[in-house]
Amino acid sequence: MNSSTSSENVFINSFSYLNQTSQAVISGNSTFANVINFPYRLGLSFIGAVNLQYEQTVKSEEIPPTLRSVFDTIGFFFSPYAIFCFVIAIVLNRFVVFYAVLNNGSRRTLPLWLSNVFHVSAVVVLAMVSLGPLTLGKDFKILGDPAFAQEKFLLNIFYAFAYSYCVETIFTIMRNSSPLEGTDYSLFELSIQFYTMTNNNTKFLDSPDYIIDCSMAILSRILIHLVEIFRLRNYRLLFSTIMNLCHICYLGIRVKQGGWKSLPFSVKFRHFPKLFSVSIICLSLLIFKLSCLIRWDPFGKSRNSCELLQFYPLSRNWKKYLNYTGEEDFSAMATKFALLLCSGTELMEKGIRREFPAINIPDNVNEKFFISGYLNELSKPYKENTSISFPKKNSSILKQRFFLMFPKSIIWIMKKLVGQVFFGFRDNKDEDIPDNDPSKMLKITKTNSLNNSAGHKEDIELELLNTSDDEYSEDYEPSEVESLGDSDEENLEEDSLIFNETRDALLDLFSSEDNEVHTDYNWIMSTSRILQQKLLSDKTLTRASILDTKLSEVDETFGTESDFDLSCAVCKVNERNTVLWPCRCFAICEDCRISLGLRGFSTCVCCRSKVHGYCKVHPVSDSK
């Protein structure tokens, strides 16, 4: 019995995760406590068995490479690099959000000395930790310091990088600016690289590529702080280009000596996009220069032989296409430039200079990009292209036109001056014409036909009302009441003869220069209305009755014109509310416009001209 008990104790001690008697949720030996504590102890035993199995598997050398990579990936998320990177990202993100809410768009200026102190402190910290990768493996006394041991200096470099990111982000956000960041050496990439180097026990002395890579990362952060201290943010791209070109030259020499496979995986993964972009740019420039060299004609009239090449517009305006400010990193600009060079192949059609479209957006859409002008709504009224292509400023055509037009301009100016002097001495005052009865009679007989306008309507009223009570027209027939008041017939005949002679003299006086009296057909047409009313009416004609008749006709004419038909010219049902451009026809409704557009109509239904677009209007009728 004792032997069996001792063997059980040895078995439990060899597997410590089985002994969970000390762990309990409810203390005591009651049935309720055992029911609760048994699943809890069973779960703890299972977790202990899994942990023991994991430790033994990691220590064994027979583990497959794929399974080891899975273990390394899981272990990275619990490493100090990943945890610190996650905490820094959350803190900076919350700071940016809360500061944007509290700031409320107002610009705040921080003291320069405060930001300079923190930037200088970041530079000092980065310089101190950079002594590790630069002097590692050398027999220097500084390596005796425990802070520069291989197990600790990678973590110190990572902490220095995190401090540099915090200083740059916080102080640039407080100045309402954008922080300067490096695309090659982000905090997350450095955490993965440092964890891999620590987990694999990589020696810096055996891998100088890691030393150069860490040195480039530190120099990029120091460069950011220096341009912030000296206020040279616009020159950051220049300094970054010089530094990266030197590093690319080193990588080229390194690949030439040991091959591409000799580089560590993290170095190849980080710098391959930059190297690929630089290769595309160099290859494009080389092909462009060779094309220019082939087209170059030393004896030709044209000085520039590359204008017909597809790359020529970009070579002249590449700064506008890239739209850089100088604050960008070299890797980001190289990638952007390479993408710009490669995106042109998607826009090219049969190689006819369609690689790079115009930068300015046109006012109207090209006709081949929409089905019909009835479907192209214009936000502004259509403007016809009335631009004239003038010759250049120093062209020979302009000089010839100037010399030809100069004498004509002088002659025109002289004529103008002589005319002003000549007409300046003339008396242009109008002579007053006596307001007598025969002249008024002549004026009435020479009036034009009645026009359908409101102004002419008022003129008719004034003309008929201001006429004197005496009537001298030949077709006037006095009433019987008026004839009784006359003296006798002989006096009337004498007066009429005198009046006729006076009228004939006035007509001769106001006739044309050739003394030929022309027949006034307007006067005949005006008297036809009086004759017609005389034949249709038995009453005596008076001036008031004629005036009432003419005014009623004018009112009827205005009434008919004001009632304009606003129904659609196509369906005759809906109200028209669409203006077509550029013909300006206001003829159709919205439903008919959509129907005509979907059917592919491109001409106006009224004038048959080309339709480029339409505008919606809201007509207001008198009935409303």
Swiss-Prot record:
Its main location: nucleus. Glycans are attached at N2, N19, N29. A zinc finger (RING-type) spans 568-608. The chain crosses the membrane at residues 70-90, 117-137, 153-173, 210-230, 274-294. The keyword Iron does not apply. Residues 468-490 have a biased composition (Acidic residues). It catalyses: S-ubiquitinyl-[E2 ubiquitin-conjugating enzyme]-L-cysteine + [acceptor protein]-L-lysine = [E2 ubiquitin-conjugating enzyme]-L-cysteine + N(6)-ubiquitinyl-[acceptor protein]-L-lysine. It is a multi-pass membrane protein. One of its GO terms (cellular component) is nuclear periphery. It is found in: Nucleus inner membrane. GO terms for molecular function: ubiquitin protein ligase activity; ubiquitin-protein transferase activity; zinc ion binding. Its EC number is 2.3.2.27. One of its GO terms (biological process) is cellular response to amino acid stimulus. Glycosylation is not required for ASI1 function. PANTHER family: E3 UBIQUITIN-PROTEIN LIGASE RNF26. This is ERAD-associated E3 ubiquitin-protein ligase ASI1. The lineage of its organism: Eukaryota, Fungi, Dikarya, Ascomycota, Saccharomycotina. The gene is ASI1.
